[in-house]
Amino acid sequence: MAQLLFRKTTQDFRDCFGLKHEILASIYNEKSTFSSENGSIQILEEAEVNALGELVRDGTVAISFGPGIYSRMFSHLRDDSDYRSALTDCVAHGWKQTRDARDVREWQRSAAIMCAERYMYKVRQAYKRVVENLDHMYAWHYLTEGPSEHVFILPAMYESVRHETTSEAYGMQCGGIIGGNVSLMLPRDEQYTTLFKAWLMSLAKMSLSELREPHWNGVRVQLSRDHRILYYGDLLPSDGDITYLVNKLEYHTIWFPEGDFETMMGAMLRDSFPAGCHAHLNIPVPHYFVFDTDDDLILRCWKGVRDTWIKLRLGYEEGGVNDSRMSEALIVNRDLPADLSESLFCCCLARGVSRDQVRTLKDVRNVAQAQIRHVVSGQGVWWEHMVRGQPLACSIRPGKVVLVVDYEDGPLHVSIRVRLLNVHYARELGMKASDVVVRIPTSNRPRWVETKEYERSLRFYEFRPGPITTEFHHVFAFYCYWGCGRVEKRRHLYQIREVRRGNLYSRSRFLRRIAEDGEKVKVQGRTHVTATRAVQHEKCNPNEDIIYSREFARELALTGKIKEAGALAVIYTCMQTLGVDIDPPAGWVREGRPKQRTAKLCHLLTRILTAFFSYRGGSSSLVCSVMVVIFSIILYYLRLKHVDQEVRYDELTLIWYGDGGVELQRILREVSMTRFVAVAGDPATPEYIAQAKLWANKKSNIVVFNYARPYERGPVFENLIRDTVSLREAAEVFILRTDDSWSQYGNTVVAMLGEGDFCDLVHFGASCDPMEHYFVHISQPPGTNPGYEPANQEEPFEEWLYETQAMERVIPTTWESEIVDARGMLVSILTFHFRFAGWFELDVPGDDIGRGLQLMGSINKVVHVSCFVQNGRRYFRLSVDLDVDRVLRNMRHEGDALMAAELFVTDAVLVCEGLVVGEMHRLQRTYRSVNAMVYHQGMTNFIVYEWMRRVLLTNLLDEMLVFDIGGRNGELSGWVVQDVKVHYFCVDPAGEEAIPKGQRVRLPGGRAIWDIAETVEQNVARYLEVVGKPQTPAEGIILIFSNSIVAAYEAAGRNNRNQVANLYQQLQAWGGRVFIRDQLVPTRANPGDYWIQAAFPGNVYPPGLCEDFNIDPDAGILPLRYPDTGQGATDVVLANGRLGHLTSSWFQSLYCGAARGFILNGFGRLIWPIYCRHVVVLATRP
């Protein structure tokens, strides 16, 4: 079993604090909305409306908020009449419009939002009373006199509102500490801990009756528990939702502000009341919980067991746990029932349970019994108890609480330079703003200087998850693998292949979870929670070029159905990857009862899309599920294309197994598809498959298996897949959702199919994962000519997935998930251990801006500078995004010291000194959504590093000369200079900056270039002569070509393929080592053909919407900056054993994206499986 990655964070503790100006802005922001404050609504019990539209039952809803002033709930501000009144109004308004009681959940959700926003208004008014009394009722704790930020202690503000004032609660005249300042030069978490303890001590001192100094180690502060969820509506039963039941408990938290963990533990064990604590504290101040009765403690323990299950389940689904602790089980001072005692131990050992399976207390108890038997039998756990080499079953004494020690620790290694000519103009420019962006070039003669003055003050923040940028037409696009052209078989340099599984698989999912903001997408400048909500939004419409790209879509758009027209235009264009044309005839929209089959089909699809766009909300995967239904209906039509019988779509039988079926059923009812059957549950279980076989006794038109457990692996899951695919015999069109695991069992599945059957893999743009596919099988159709077979069947489509998913060790896997400080981040990069990307901040006095720019310019050439005043002194805040290339190029690590190359900061200092004073603020940065080409280029240097590392391992020479052809400013220098015997030389006439870890090759007449009129040996000989090493053997020389080298040859003559092929032949014969970056492997033998078959992407969208692609009528579709190497070059590579391909898999590219701060945009996710199949790098064997 794969080891679950655990990444311990302090975010729970950091959420207890808020910057003063941000908190005040939230309190006085009257335009705050439920969604802007990250509000969440959960419907526990659905409201009930009778046939007359009268509200019979209110139901129950739970409301919660993200970090901030609303995160902790005030029960005294809650009013059930607000919810009742809002729900009555929503039901009355909704009933007038639809008269459909099935919409009651949406009415209930709308009422909850209205109620929540009324509650938010009351919270703001309560906090206003607190901040208006800051000066005379509360104290401000100052930790430093230097540059600092002022922060509120949110729990202190919460206590002030809950008890009206803290002074009333404690009978004192002072309200205690409510905030303070934290130094910008010291670690933030340590200062937060000091400030939190100071607040608790202020409460303790107010409650002391004696003046003598107490023993501070034993001081304790008792506070009532805080609430994070607010419930409205009807009461739930005593064995109902367990979160609801625990929320109703009133217990206390005992804090030890000056004590240690052992002191707290001893006090908890001696407490006369039922009590418990966590083994790992999310707030680093010792504390435990005290309950009124044993039953309350037991209920809270069951909640801990349940929360651990859910956390583990999500961890395996998402690749890891990013939290303050792994286990939520409590250590208690009471003897517990045997089943609970054993569950506190067993809950940590298996894969967890989904939230829906353990909603109620009864569910938790039932699952606990089953899991105890599961663990005791030794099945399905990640650990083994060994005695003398023999595995033993787990033995737990009833009534004894056992702590899993050290489980929380997890695995150990789980631009242009502008010279200012007018100083006065620079100052005038600065006076117009309080912040500015400056560029810091490297000095002409760089020397290495130490950066220790500001290393301790430097702060690092990880990027926040970012939304995926996409467009309307990308969501409805798809393609079939077999229709995307054929690529010649490659020769890989590294033949160590591993299927993506185990720990690497978990980490890849974990990387996506950290970098991507859930399933949020950004469309046309607006951020939406899901792609489903995005395309349903009234202001999200397709581009006109899409609508008018097909005549039938233009006709539909004229009727006002803009979204439907745009979606159908994309869908019908994508069907051309199957080589079919099913456009309806002219005038099809005006036919009331169409008789022509293509018109009838188009009318049906239009009604489905209309029902989907008008559907209120829906899950994140709903749009993808709708696309699967539409695609399956089209395939069913194609299967019967040559059959004379009439097709009646209202009699179409479609069985949907797995997630999304209930929502689809509501949509398809609107179009009279009454024979759609949704079978709820998890398809990835033997019990579910047994149930499916009962449905399979009768032939169905379409069967869809929508799997939702992608983290499962192993022979048991493969057998389950085989059993599932065997059910295809009960369907004419069979579709199975799968992911990268297809590379393990795909060949077996294809071998099960009958002769003449059609099968393919389909990739939908609506899918959130580039490696999620749908396997399609169509049984042999009646008739002799099915009319939809792909033109090219020479290569099995499984090879597409293997090339893009199987593991090739071309990227270093030295990945670290632990959180480190700013200096640790820089040291990790310099030792080629990569982590999650982020940004750096530094505050420097106004008279020392030069040294600050020196350090920050070594991390990124572009520096954001703002000016503020602190304690009457002028400061500058410098912030930069992490640039891995820049750090490796301009910094080095010597012993314990960090050294940076000297930069030219004079011009930037002049601009910064002219800034006016503004408010101090922190820029919140997210992972950047980039196109496929930027994402792929971000991987290349990682590949170069690993290849260079292998070269050095096999090299026996005293020195190696690296010539980077087209290296611009030597961004690659830090990646290849891994040893003192490596010397880097840049050959490029366009570079502007000096290279600290190398030098440029300069000729008497200027900078050296690669002369395409000369041979490889002649060019190399000229370089060696210039650098003074003419006797260097070829074995000691490395040539690294940028992706512009082939373009340079092509520029000499149109389609200059022969010269390019000649270059590759020379490189094959030459004795040195060669690396060629980012080349394009053509699809066809004819160099003039498209690199991807004409059906994609040129016909998927109009040329103007093919993002990042040039449309050349002579050469076909070429991606920008990636020239076509020509078939001749590929033939040379395949014919000779010296040059080979280096291709990285999708999950390895995630490492690079996370290290650079990139996430792939919507079009990139659509095209990525094909893109990384064609764009490769070439190199000689190390």
Curated annotation (Swiss-Prot):
Signal peptide: none annotated. It is found in: Host membrane. The keyword DNA-binding does not apply. This is Uncharacterized protein VP3. The lineage of its organism: Viruses, Riboviria, Orthornavirae, Duplornaviricota, Resentoviricetes. The chain crosses the membrane at residues 618-638. It is a single-pass membrane protein. InterPro entries: VP3-like. GO terms for cellular component: host cell membrane; membrane. It comes from Colorado tick fever virus (strain USA/Florio N-7180). Keywords: Host membrane, Membrane, Transmembrane, Transmembrane helix. Pfam families: VP3-like. It comes from the Viruses. Its main location: host cell.
